[in-house]
Amino acid sequence: MSTPAADGFRMPAEWTPHERTWMAWPGPNPTFDHPDDLAESCRAWADVARAIRRFEPVTVVCGPGRSAEARDLLGPGIDTVERDLDDAWMRDIGPTFLTDGKGGLAAVDWTFNGWGAQSWARWEHDAKIAAYVGDLAGAKTYASKLVNEGGAIHVDGEGTVLLTETVQLGAERNPGWTREQVETEIHAHLGTSKAIWLPRGLTGDYPPHGFGTLGHVDIVAAFARPGVVVAHHQPDPAHPDHEVSKEVIGLLKAATDAHGRRIEVVEVPAPTVLEADGHWADYSYINHYLCNGGVVLCGFDDPRDETAAGIFRRLFPERTVTLVDARTIFSGGGGIHCITQQQPKN
């Protein structure tokens, strides 16, 4: 059986041109278990979609009968389609898109099991969304037996991928898989050749701190360009992520990429708030989304919002940085990057 890499496909970096962005619309489920929570979440998702639509097309997958409500909040110019959904995190349930540099488009359909079969998760329908979206996009779909999500990987487009040990190597997702087997599967499906492993994610991403993914990398570290990584920095020693971020930053600074370059780390300070919803806050500016000509950045009505925006403006001077309040999204277990999935131009 062929693999994407063997067929000439690779995952391009997020900063390369996009054809469109895919999202999923919130519906009644354990994540949004009260009508007020659901209504607030729909407004938050719509705010993100509208911010992205300024820069590129957006398609939102809605549960049956929910597209009319979605369009009312989304406004004009955003497409909707209907399909059975369990949740609304398109980064994780959607496909990982690949290109071959010759006009071809492919999609990886990772195995999805509700972020490690967590007690609150439902995934009967979400496990089928990647293949559905890939088909709508006209992509050649490759299925992988690896339990993985889009928020658990971040690539530089030049052969390097960021991973976390508690996700791909966790018994909740891939019992019996060795590190070497995981790397082989990842490289075969992303076209990468070097993995940089981080030990874990942020504290709030694990039980008992509400809804979490057990350590997704896209809230901790992300490539800004080849050889340069933005990393979450918690400056307050009262927060357990002070030690977590110090360890992650140290590992990144000691790492090299697929081309042997030493990683340059740009530290982005966490918002000042330490707790949210009765748990340690995992608010992070790292969970941003790059779209054509824009950076959609998580905002928290926090004094450090503008500090973070300034860092991203310096990193991406050719892009418009837009802050969108992400506190409601984070209360459900993720951020702006978690609810978006880019389809690259092919």
From Swiss-Prot:
Is this entry keyworded Hydrolase?
Answer: yes
The source's superkingdom equals Bacteria
* Reaction(s) catalysed (UniProt annotation): agmatine + H2O = N-carbamoylputrescine + NH4(+)
The enzyme's E.C. designation: 3.5.3.12
Give an example GO molecular function. Answer: protein-arginine deiminase activity
What Gene3D superfamilies would the database entry show? L-arginine/glycine Amidinotransferase, Chain A (3.75.10.10)
Q: Where is the signal peptide?
A: none
GO annotations under biological process? putrescine biosynthetic process
Q: List the disulfide bonds.
A: none
Similarity remark: Belongs to the agmatine deiminase family.
Protein's recorded name: Putative agmatine deiminase
